[in-house]
Amino acid sequence: QFQDGSIVTISGTSMLTFADVGQKKLRLKQGAFTADVVPQPVGKPMIIQTPSTVIEVVGTRFEVEALQAFTTVNVREGNVRLKHLVDGNAVDIPADYRVIAEAGGDLSPMPLPAAENYWKSQLDVQAGGFGKWLPAIKKRPAAQKALPFIPVNNPNVNLSLLSIPVSGRSGPPVVLTPHATFRVRGRLHDSAQVHFGIAVSYDNGEFAGMFRGDLLKKQPVSEIAEEKEFEAVYQLSDFTVDPCVREKQDSLARTPDGLYLDRLWIFTDTGRSSGLMVHEVELIPGEIR
């Protein structure tokens, strides 16, 4: 939060640097953030630089996602000016519109897509998030592979962790319904408990909390088949507040029902590499029977 009350919230594995010496200047090297910017001084808009664009903000609510190949800007309120670094072309993006800026692409603003309740990962292309993306080969589909991760506040724990971004950037926003179910398919070296969490936001893009689907009921061990494959299911009604945000819970949502799904993460806690990789995550707006 800046001194004037403007708020920028990063998500996932994002890299953001900033300065505020007379004018706010941010550089999003990769990842995504949401922002609620109060009106800025005349002639001194907030400047945001991504690998491919420069964005000028006077006062608005918006979201940005930056990858090497393109930048996505969703505007909720106000007006945002985007300039493409490659050719210098610029566009003003009004409220309730978005632009996906890529080399040689059209900068015409498009209406923000309507929210959906069903979602399925698209791992045939690089997903972003945390982990190593593996393209499809003859023996298996494309996958996001977990990487070693040691929590800062618990250095004795060694997890195998991956995350996948979901909502409100290059695709339509995804809203969670009370009886929704997540189904995860992937591979493991050995049978293990597969833990699952989500991050959610309000409809204005503001961070709303983090929840875990494996704490209320102990997640059973995911047994592997002949090809080391596993499937795990998580009911939204079983999700509880993630311990890492429990101290801030008074200011966050108590349940994920009706909120926007921003990203998800999946991990094992076996003390060693589990070989965890995920081929597919599916959100179904109703219980799996």
Q: Where does each model-flagged region fall?
A:
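Hydrophobic residues on conserved beta-strands that form the core of alpha/beta folds
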Residues: 57-59, 75, 93, 261, ...
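Short, polar/charged, low-complexity connector loops/linkers at domain or secondary-structure junctions
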Residues: 41-50, 55, 64, 70-71, ...
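Noncatalytic modules at the cell exterior or secretory-pathway interfaces
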Residues: 256-265
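Short, small-residue-rich packing micro-motifs
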Residues: 1-64, 69-84
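Extracellular beta-strand elements of beta-rich domains used
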Residues: 234, 264, 279-283
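Extracellular ligand-binding interfaces
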Residues: 154-248, 260, 270-277, 288
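Short carbohydrate-recognition loop motifs
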Residues: 134-168
